[in-house]
Design a protein with these regions (language model features):
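Alpha-helical ds-nucleic-acid-binding substructure associated with the helix-hairpin-helix region
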Residues: 143-229, 241-246
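C-terminal accessory module of base-excision DNA glycosylases/AP lyases that mediates lesion recognition
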Residues: 2-102, 217-227, 233-343
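Structural motif
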Residues: 103-115, 166-174, 306-318
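Alpha-helix N-cap/helix-initiation sites
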Residues: 110, 127-132, 171-175, 233, ...
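Short alpha-helix boundary/capping elements
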Residues: 124-126, 130, 142-143, 186, ...
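Short, hydrophobic/amphipathic alpha-helical patches that form generic packing surfaces
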Residues: 114-124, 180, 317-328
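Extended cationic-aromatic binding surfaces that line active-site or macromolecule-binding grooves
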Residues: 109-141
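A general alpha-helix detector
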Residues: 116-120, 134-137, 158, 162, ...
Length: 343
């Protein structure tokens, strides 16, 4: 398995393309997490069956072609997993021992704080496999640092121990950064545990939510850079990419796609201009009969049980991260060949 460098080693730090600079319309300014959309358009039924697409096709060396629509559907299917993630990550995710993992847990089931932890780890100079293993180790038993309160209570030494078990590089510095972040986001532990159960509704998390409401992804990234030690542009972009699938946060950030993820999407053969076009493509071109549950492991069975907006958001994040994974795993060619042969 190739030992690929992490996202920030392949991205131009600090750069946001035009589509990333477009800020989502903020809701009313308030010191609460971004509220779910008060008024939603009529619920759309998932599109089924084939639909003609004018989007460009990517040519393969064998003479076969794969259209953007076909690649989109293939990436969202369970058949694409082996080309997007390391084998040991998928084996661990399928084992049933880990309720939270990067590859198979829908991003809508992560809390905002868990997305912060994930962004912190994936933005470090680690290999693809080490980054995901670190996320899995920290967020599941015997550690289970899913809230800032739990991480703060554990202390820096325990965080270091978890990172050592994951065989993570730069353990000491990363443990220190994560502990400081937990201290920053932890609520008042003398109060009831309700805030902890929601991923840390502390004043600091509310400040982050307010930044998202006021200025969209750009303001969110700027706020994180100025308040969370060790988290830069790339970490902020990863956070925005993932947290938009969480209930309430999409109002301020959706739809957001960072430049690295968009580049990966184009590299695998999905030729789109921006995040808005990706959203439109998902809403119009996904064949639900073929995609099914996307191979994701859910607490509640069945993609049709979810709110339509959540479904689209999960697919949006999933297709971006699977495209990134194929690039990082150096399996773009294999992915394209499999997509062309997929029926």
């Amino acid at each position: 398995m190739p030992d690929r460098t992490k996202e920030e080693q392949q991205a131009k730090s600090g750069e946001l393309k035009d589509e990333e600079k477009e800020e989502a319309k903020a809701g009313q300014k308030r010191k609460t997490p971004p509220a779910s959309k008060a008024e939603k358009p009529p619920k759309k039924e998932p599109r089924q069956g084939a639909r003609a697409s004018a989007r460009s096709a990517g040519k393969l060396g064998s003479g076969a072609t794969v259209t953007s629509k076909q690649m989109l559907n293939f990436l969202l299917s369970k058949d694409a997993l082996e080309y997007c993630y390391p084998a040991d990550e998928l084996e661990a995710a399928h084992s049933g021992k880990f309720s939270k993992n990067y590859s198979l847990t829908p991003p809508s089931l992560f809390t905002p704080f868990e997305h912060l932890v994930t962004a912190h780890l994936l933005s470090k100079p680690l290999s693809h496999v080490l980054g995901m293993r670190s996320v899995r180790t920290l967020l599941n038993p015997p550690y289970g640092y899913s809230t800032p309160e739990e991480m703060k209570k554990a202390g820096e030494d325990k965080i270091y121990q978890a990172l050592e078990q994951a065989k993570t590089q730069h353990r000491q510095k990363t443990a220190a950064y994560l502990f400081e972040m937990a201290e920053l986001y932890a609520g008042d532990l003398s109060k009831d545990a309700s805030s902890a159960s929601h991923g840390g509704d502390s004043d600091t998390m509310l400040d982050l939510a307010e930044a998202a409401n006021d200025g969209g992804p750009r303001a969110t990234i700027s706020h994180l850079k100025s308040t969370v030690k060790g988290l830069g542009d790339i970490g902020g972009q990863i956070f925005c990419r993932r947290v938009q699938a969480c209930d309430g946060w999409g109002e301020a950030i959706w739809p957001y796609a960072d430049s690295k993820a968009m580049d990966a999407l184009r590299e695998v053969g999905i030729k789109i201009a921006d995040a808005d076009e990706l959203q439109e493509m998902i809403e119009q071109d996904v064949d639900w009969d073929k995609v099914g549950d996307m191979g994701l492991v859910r607490e509640k069975e069945g993609v049709d049980e979810q709110d339509y907006d959540v479904q689209v958001a999960v697919e949006f994040v999933t297709v971006l991260e699977r495209a990134l994974g194929a690039v990082l795993e150096d399996k773009v060619g294999q992915l394209k060949k499999a997509a062309a042969e997929w029926t």
